[in-house]
């Protein structure tokens, strides 16, 4: 167990790790990866305590395409609903000797506790507002496919920064490669405690000036308490929603990204092309194949 390497945070990556995973993902994207059944006779358990379309489906498709036996546990009908403690549940699953457990949980940091109770490899598929490392890898992959290098790119992340695990993971990963990170959000949804951030704006038009990449985030109302003041949907779109007119403030070759799910008319208008956003989904599948491959147990 001491030799295993979990994937819980972007901070678990070295620069070499990222390069190797991106190289593998490129091979999977082009269907050129050798030994496509590399996970044959391996078992992957997907344990998702939050709703998911993109991440769950892509992890399941990735594992199956690599030859793994895949178990996606229906949490809503599991023993958790009979009062079983989460630690006991993870120990029970670990006793079945899977090779991977892929976890999404609504509580920030919970994956670090769970990792102490398993002998298999644990992959964080999103924990509360904390981290989403494979989404950050997918976003890095997309950006690097459109831009010559990450260094010195002005990357603007706009939206509900406070509650976003995608923002946290992207900030850390992209800064590792020298990007200039700018945040745009309402004052009540910003987080000022990122040493990696270069600038903060409370106006989208000001923030995206000369931007190379604009990454939009949805309002995560399910994580907000009743005392969290936010603009109405209409006000939010007026101030922080991106449309084709506001996009003119960015560089002419700027790319627009969104990790999904998208709320049209709130953070983005329908007149913005979603080509890159769909590419994030496509590249996300290749990244998850690469991650399962790269971290495969001996």
Curated annotation (Swiss-Prot):
Give me the gene this protein comes from: pyrB
The name this protein goes by in its record:
Aspartate carbamoyltransferase catalytic subunit
What Enzyme Commission number(s) appear in the record? 2.1.3.2
State the PROSITE patterns in the record.
CARBAMOYLTRANSFERASE
Q: What family is this?
A: Belongs to the aspartate/ornithine carbamoyltransferase superfamily. ATCase family.
Q: Which Pfam families match?
A: OTCace, OTCace_N
Instruction: Kindly tell me the pathway this chain contributes to.
Output: Pyrimidine metabolism; UMP biosynthesis via de novo pathway; (S)-dihydroorotate from bicarbonate: step 2/3
Question: What HAMAP family does this protein map onto?
Answer: Asp_carb_tr
Q: Which reaction does it catalyse?
A: carbamoyl phosphate + L-aspartate = N-carbamoyl-L-aspartate + phosphate + H(+)
Task: Name the GO cellular-component terms.
Answer: cytosol
Cite the Gene3D superfamilies for this sequence: Aspartate/ornithine carbamoyltransferase
Could you tell me the keywords of this UniProt record? Pyrimidine biosynthesis, Transferase
- Subunit field text: Heterododecamer (2C3:3R2) of six catalytic PyrB chains organized as two trimers (C3), and six regulatory PyrI chains organized as three dimers (R2).
Protein's GO biological process: 'de novo' pyrimidine nucleobase biosynthetic process; 'de novo' UMP biosynthetic process; amino acid metabolic process
**Enzyme class at the top of the EC tree:** transferase
Query: Which GO terms label this protein's molecular function in UniProt?
Result: amino acid binding; aspartate carbamoyltransferase activity
Per UniProt, where does carbamoyl phosphate bind?
Answer: 54-55, 104, 132, 135, 260-261
Q: What does this protein do?
A: Catalyzes the condensation of carbamoyl phosphate and aspartate to form carbamoyl aspartate and inorganic phosphate, the committed step in the de novo pyrimidine nucleotide biosynthesis pathway.
Against InterPro entries, the record matches this protein to: Asp/Orn_carbamoyltranf_P-bd, Asp/Orn_carbamoylTrfase, Asp/Orn_carbamoylTrfase_sf, Asp_carbamoyltransf, Asp_carbamoyltransf_Asp/Orn-bd
């Amino acid at each position: 167990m001491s030799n295993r390497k979990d994937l819980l945070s972007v901070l678990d990556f070295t620069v070499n790790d990222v390069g190797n995973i991106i190289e593998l993902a490129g091979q999977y994207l082009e269907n050129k990866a050798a030994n496509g059944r590399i996970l044959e006779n391996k078992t992957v358990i997907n344990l998702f305590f939050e709703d998911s379309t993109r991440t769950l489906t892509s992890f399941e498709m990735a594992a199956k395409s690599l030859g793994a036996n895949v178990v996606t546990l229906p949490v809503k009908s599991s023993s958790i609903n009979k009062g079983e403690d989460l630690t006991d549940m993870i120990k029970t699953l670990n006793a079945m000797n899977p090779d991977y457990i892929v976890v999404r949980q609504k509580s920030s940091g919970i994956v670090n506790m769970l990792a102490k109770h398993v002998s298999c490899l644990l992959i964080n598929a999103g924990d509360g507002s904390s981290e989403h490392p494979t989404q950050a890898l997918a976003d890095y992959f997309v950006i690097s496919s459109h831009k010559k290098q990450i260094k010195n790119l002005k990357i603007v992340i706009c939206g509900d920064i406070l509650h976003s695990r995608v923002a946290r993971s992207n900030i850390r990963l992209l800064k590792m490669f020298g990007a200039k990170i700018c945040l745009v959000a309402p004052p009540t949804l910003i987080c000022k405690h990122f040493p990696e951030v270069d600038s903060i704006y409370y106006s989208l038009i000001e923030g995206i000036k000369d931007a190379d990449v604009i990454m939009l985030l949805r309002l995560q109302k399910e994580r907000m308490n009743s005392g969290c003041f936010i603009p109405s949907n209409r006000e939010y779109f007026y101030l922080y929603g991106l449309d084709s007119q506001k996009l003119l403030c960015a560089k002419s070759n700027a790319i627009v990204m969104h990790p999904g799910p998208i709320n049209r008319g709130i953070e983005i208008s329908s007149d913005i092309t979603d080509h890159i956003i769909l590419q994030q989904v496509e590249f996300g599948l290749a990244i998850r194949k690469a991650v399962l491959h790269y971290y495969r147990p001996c």
